[in-house]
Design a protein with these regions (language model features):
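Alpha-helical segment of the N-proximal tetratricopeptide repeat
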Residues: 4-35
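Residue at a conserved register position within TPR or TPR-like alpha-solenoid repeats
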Residues: 16, 50-51, 85, 119
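Canonical tetratricopeptide repeat
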Residues: 45-46, 80, 114
Length: 154
């Protein structure tokens, strides 16, 4: 069956990708995407592998973007697109991809974690206290609210 062959190739490629063997993962991802051309996950992960192994940013972005357009409510597809952008050194685009993902797949905590990794945190209000100190936390919340009301970014 073509579907099981594609899934087997994808699974092998994903294992190699997660173990950081991107060059070995590439043929498996290509094969999976060839066998099942309209599968957004296969397309998206092929984009990630192309970006990490061959630095083909344009092709990788196109694959991931097409996958996102096919299934807008799947957080992993936004995470893959953001990874392609981040690998290419396009941090702002990665943040935009995560923000778009948060609009369509709000409940997925992985998007929030990825956003926190990509964005810079403000320093604690009282630098002589630990960031987790209750006073710093409350002052930080107040600062965040005040900046939202005033429209300030930093």
């Amino acid at each position: 069956m073509m579907d099981t062959d594609a899934f087997r190739e994808f699974k092998t490629g994903l294992t190699l990708l997660r173990d950081n063997y991107v060059d070995k993962a590439l043929p498996h991802m290509k094969k999976a995407a060839e066998l099942e051309r309209n599968n957004p996950y296969y397309m998206s992960y092929l984009g990630v592998v192309l970006a990490r192994s061959e630095k083909k940013w344009g092709e990788a972005e196109s694959l991931c973007d097409s996958a996102v357009r096919m299934k807008r409510n799947q957080a992993q597809l936004y995470l893959n697109l953001a990874e392609v952008y981040a690998t290419a050194g396009r941090k702002e685009d990665a943040v935009e991809a995560i923000q778009a993902g948060l609009k369509f797949a709000r409940k997925d905590v992985r998007l929030t974690i990825a956003m926190n990794k990509l964005t810079d945190r403000r320093p604690p209000v009282l630098t002589f206290l630990n960031r987790r100190h209750p006073i710093n936390r409350q002052l930080g919340i107040l600062r965040h609210r005040a900046m939202g009301v005033l429209g300030g970014q930093r």
